[in-house]
């Protein structure tokens, strides 16, 4: 198959055969005959059985080497208006096959289109969209086509309402009502608000009542009545209604409805605790005083030691100075008088 894509040889007298034609013959003739390919260019007629009406191949095209060219054979069997993709290259898109190809396809409008195909397409599309809109809105085509769909109703009012005097004139009591279907705008916001079906808490269980027998019933005491008194809920954070609530009621509500209990103070234990705290305070003060005295004595002792060291160093320096200034011949007392300390 690839030999057909090669160029024609220059230095040879080889001429490939062009085609093999099929010719229809009569039914009594047989067409199953082998035909030899000629060496020179010529047309070969091949007969086939005309009873096989399903076959659409009318010509067989051959390659230069004598093999059947399927591409040309399939293309010739179809009409000229149809394009046959007989190879892999035919399936490749043009944008992939020629990436740098610049093409300008004609874009017609309704006015510039040579035929009425574009106009028909626009009308069909418009009709389909209108049909879908009418189906959504629930409007029939018959009612939509009628522009003046108006009905009139004649109505006669009651004597008691419009004519209190009781006159029998029907002309003054006749009314004509006009009924017209107005189309509603589908883009208007909804008129009714849809509320969610919020599930409420179930109802409380039924109360357990006492029996009506006089033997088992007993009168309520004050203690039982006080237990059944439930105080109102008072919040320390919210007061939407703005009520003024006294402090004692707020304290009762904060304690869960029970009254404030007074706490008794144990005086004996409290006295022992205060005495123990006083003793601990005294002991701590004495320890601090002793510690401060010891630190003071140590500081005085260190100061005396430093003074003694300084005196010793001064005496040593003085003796060295006297030894250096003493004359070799002379009275020591005269020199001592002249020196100034």
Swiss-Prot record:
Q: Provide the residue span(s) of the region labelled Disordered.
A: 1-31, 181-226, 302-341
- Where composition is biased (Basic residues), the residues are 192-201
UniProt entry tagged with the keyword Lipoprotein: no
Enumerate the InterPro entries for this protein.
Answer: SKI-int_prot_SKIP, SKI-int_prot_SKIP_SNW-dom
**Carries keyword Nucleus?**
yes
Question: Which keywords, in A-to-Z order, does the entry hold?
Answer: mRNA processing, mRNA splicing, Nucleus, Spliceosome
Role this protein plays:
Involved in pre-mRNA splicing.
Q: How does it assemble?
A: Associated with the spliceosome.
Protein's name in the database: Pre-mRNA-processing protein 45
Q: Which organism is it from?
A: Debaryomyces hansenii (strain ATCC 36239 / CBS 767 / BCRC 21394 / JCM 1990 / NBRC 0083 / IGC 2968) (Yeast)
The uppermost taxa in this organism's lineage are: Eukaryota, Fungi, Dikarya, Ascomycota, Saccharomycotina
């Amino acid at each position: 198959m690839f030999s057909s894509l090669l160029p024609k040889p220059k230095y040879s007298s080889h001429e490939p055969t062009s085609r093999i034609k099929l010719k229809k013959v009569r039914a009594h003739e047989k067409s199953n005959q082998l035909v030899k390919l000629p060496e020179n260019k010529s047309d070969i007629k091949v007969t086939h059985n005309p009873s096989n009406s399903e076959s659409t191949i009318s010509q067989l095209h051959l390659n230069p080497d004598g093999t059947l060219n399927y591409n040309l054979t399939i293309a010739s069997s179809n009409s000229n208006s149809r394009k046959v993709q007989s190879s892999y290259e035919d399936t490749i898109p043009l944008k992939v096959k020629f990436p740098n190809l610049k093409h300008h396809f004609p874009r017609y409008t309704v006015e510039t289109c040579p035929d009425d195909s574009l106009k028909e397409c626009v009308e069909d599309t418009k009709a389909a969209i209108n049909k879908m809109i009418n189906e959504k809105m629930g409007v029939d085509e018959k009612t939509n086509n009628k522009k003046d769909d108006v009905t009139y109703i004649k109505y006669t009012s009651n004597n008691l309402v419009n004519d209190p005097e009781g006159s029998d004139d029907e002309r003054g009591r006749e009314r004509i009502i006009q009924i017209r279907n107005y189309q509603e705008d589908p883009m208007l916001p909804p008129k009714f608000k849809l509320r969610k079906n919020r599930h409420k808490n179930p109802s409380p269980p039924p109360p357990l009542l006492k029996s009506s027998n006089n033997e088992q019933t007993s009168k309520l005491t004050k203690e039982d009545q006080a237990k059944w008194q439930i105080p109102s809920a008072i919040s320390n954070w919210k007061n939407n209604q703005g009520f003024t609530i006294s402090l004692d009621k707020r304290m009762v509500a904060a304690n869960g409805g029970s009254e404030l209990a007074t706490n008794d103070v144990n005086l004996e234990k409290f006295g022992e605790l205060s005495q123990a705290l006083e003793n601990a305070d005294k002991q701590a003060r004495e320890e601090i005083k002793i510690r401060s005295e010891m630190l003071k004595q140590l500081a005085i002792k260190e100061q005396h030691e430093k003074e003694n060291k300084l005196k010793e160093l001064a005496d040593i320096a003085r003796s060295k100075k006297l030894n250096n200034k003493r004359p070799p011949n002379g009275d020591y007392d005269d020199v001592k008088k002249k020196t100034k300390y």
